[in-house]
Regions:
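Aromatic- and glycine-rich beta-strand/loop motifs that create alpha-glucan
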Residues: 47-67
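Short, strongly hydrophobic alpha-helical membrane anchors
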Residues: 1-23
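Helix-loop-helix units of permease transmembrane domains in multi-pass membrane transporters
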Residues: 54-59, 120-149, 311
């Protein structure tokens, strides 16, 4: 009697190169999520009152409909950017990276301003903050907790939009090659474009941190509309400050003084711009990212200190 064993069937499937390149992105995203969670736990352990205020502010920001609307709008726009014909003779991906970084940054800045105004200015005007400050919670802990809550909401937005953006960049490499009738790009080519994009996400996040600190400081005195107007002014002057300073060389002493004063008081947001690196296809050096991080942290500390001074003198009664 013969026994017939069933044949073993091996199923093979093809994984596109742009998807294979994303395994490194997934590992990096997991690392960022673990790091952010560890920092939050450390904040809750070392400063429980600040952590509690930050957590409440974060939940309020995430649960509001505006957060969902901004996320959906960002995802749709990033997806739409992939299929726009830019007619750049093979450099479409550079424009996609630039537009995507600008979009994510502007959406995150708007979220930071909106959240700061809702969680600080509205609570101060509605006397809701008195219930918190009546407890053994100082004004410094209240304001710092609000700032960390805003940053936590910004981190979540950057995590969602940034992860989708890196996925779209990896696919854009394959899409452009297919449209140009070129050979299919390798995994390394897809990974190369994502590596160029990563420093841009970091710099955009640092810029959003600076603008969030300014928005929190302004929210101690002004409501949403004046806050939004002033923050947009700071954003514009921050990018134009180097140009104004360079143009003032050899001009009237008063013009030169105003230019130097503006470049000193306002944040030089051009430090967080990497369009030159994108245009040349080069990586930003780690030393530049280090000093940009130091500059952002220094200015955030300065803006928060100014906010504390403004908040200490405000009458809440």
């Amino acid at each position: 009697m013969q026994l017939f064993l069933p044949e073993t069937v091996l199923f093979s499937y093809y994984v596109p190169n742009w998807i294979q390149a994303l395994q490194w992105v997934d590992l990096g995203a997991l690392g960022v999520a673990i790091l952010a969670f560890a920092v939050f736990l450390l904040l809750m352990v070392l400063f429980p009152k600040v952590g509690a205020i930050a957590w409440v502010t974060f939940k309020e920001a995430v649960m509001q409909p505006l957060f969902i609307i901004l996320i959906l709008f960002g995802l749709f726009a990033l997806f739409f950017f992939l299929f726009i014909p830019y007619h750049t003779l093979g450099d479409d991906i550079k424009l996609v990276i630039t537009q995507g970084l600008t979009l994510i940054k502007l959406i995150a800045v708007f979220l930071a301003i909106w959240t700061a105004s809702n969680s600080i200015a509205d609570e101060l005007e509605g006397k809701t903050a008195l219930m918190i400050l009546a407890k053994p919670v100082g004004r410094r802990k209240f304001l710092i907790g609000k700032y960390f809550g805003v940053i936590m909401a910004v981190i979540l937005m950057f995590f969602i939009l940034g992860l989708f953006f890196l996925n779209s960049i990896s696919y854009k490499v394959v899409f452009d090659a297919r449209e140009s009738a070129k050979d299919a790009p390798t995994v390394l080519e897809c990974l190369h474009q994502m590596k160029i994009t990563l420093p841009g996400l970091l710099l955009s996040f640092l810029e959003t941190m600076v603008m969030a600190a300014i928005a929190v400081a302004i929210s101690t005195r002004l409501s949403l509309l004046p806050n939004l107007t002033l923050c947009l002014t700071v954003l514009a002057v921050g990018y134009l400050a180097p140009v104004i300073l360079e143009a003032s060389i050899g001009q009237n002493p008063l013009v030169a003084f105003v230019a130097r004063f503006a470049s000193t008081i306002f944040p030089v947001l051009a430090h967080f711009n990497m369009e030159t690196s994108i245009a040349t296809g080069q990586f930003l050096p780690n030393l530049y990212l280090f000093w940009a991080t130091c500059y952002a942290l220094l200015y955030c500390t300065l803006a928060t200190t100014v906010g504390l001074l403004l908040f200490e003198d405000r009458d809440l009664a």
